[in-house]
């Protein structure tokens, strides 16, 4: 399964392009622009599992830096600042990683 099986390729392209400048990433706007906010809880979980590259059941900080590439392979990496801000927004229990429920909450709050 690929991201375009769940989300519109044109929406992904526009969203990735909107945040092409370093330190411009806004997860709330991004999740809305790619159409993730409108998806079912099941589809949000499928996206989480695609972003969890090492299949640990969590998105760790190193994976989080590549989150845009999870949507589009030619997208940029997040800056260290953006990665830390996204982790702070998503890591509700403070364990240094984002679980599937935390990711679902992060998307729902956007």
UniProtKB/Swiss-Prot annotation:
Q: Does the keyword GTP-binding apply?
A: no
**Alphabetical list of Pfam families matching this protein:** EF-hand_7
Q: Where is the EF-hand domain?
A: 39-74, 78-110
Q: Where does Ca(2+) 1 bind?
A: 52, 54, 56, 58, 60, 63
One CC-aspect GO term: cytoplasm
Phosphoserine modified-residue sites: 2, 24
Q: Which GO molecular function annotation, any one, does this entry have?
A: calcium ion binding
Detail the disulphide connectivity of this chain as listed in its UniProt entry: none
Q: Does the keyword Calcium apply?
A: yes
Q: Which UniProt keywords apply?
A: Acetylation, Calcium, Metal-binding, Muscle protein, Phosphoprotein, Repeat
How does this protein's activity vary with temperature?
Thermostable between pH 4.0-9.5. Average melting temperature (Tm) across all pH values is 72 degrees Celsius. Lower melting temperature in acidic pH 4.0-5.0.
Q: Which InterPro entries match?
A: EF-hand-dom_pair, EF_Hand_1_Ca_BS, EF_hand_dom, Parvalbumin
Detail which positions bind Ca(2+) 2: 91, 93, 95, 97, 102
- A GO BP annotation: gene expression
Residues annotated as carrying N-acetylserine in the record are 2
Q: What CDD domains does this protein's entry cite?
A: EFh_parvalbumin_alpha (cd16254)
**Stated role:** In muscle, parvalbumin is thought to be involved in relaxation after contraction. It binds two calcium ions.
Q: Which family does it belong to?
A: Belongs to the parvalbumin family.
Which PANTHER family does the entry link to? PARVALBUMIN ALPHA
**Domains: entry comment:** AB domain, comprising of helices A and B, is involved in structural stabilization, protecting the hydrophobic core of the protein. It is required for high-affinity binding of Ca(2+) and for Mg(2+)-binding.
UniProt-recorded name of the protein: Parvalbumin alpha
Encoding gene, per UniProt annotation: PVALB
């Amino acid at each position: 399964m690929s991201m375009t099986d769940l989300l519109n390729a044109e929406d992904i392209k526009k969203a990735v392009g909107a945040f092409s400048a370093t330190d411009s990433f806004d997860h709330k706007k991004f999740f809305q622009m790619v159409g993730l906010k409108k998806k079912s809880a099941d589809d949000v979980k499928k996206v989480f599992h695609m972003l969890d590259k090492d299949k640990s059941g969590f998105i760790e900080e190193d994976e989080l830096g590549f989150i845009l590439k999870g949507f589009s392979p030619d997208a940029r990496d997040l800056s260290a600042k953006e990665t830390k801000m996204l982790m702070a927004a998503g890591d509700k229990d403070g364990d240094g990683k984002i679980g599937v429920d935390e990711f679902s909450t992060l998307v729902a709050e956007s």
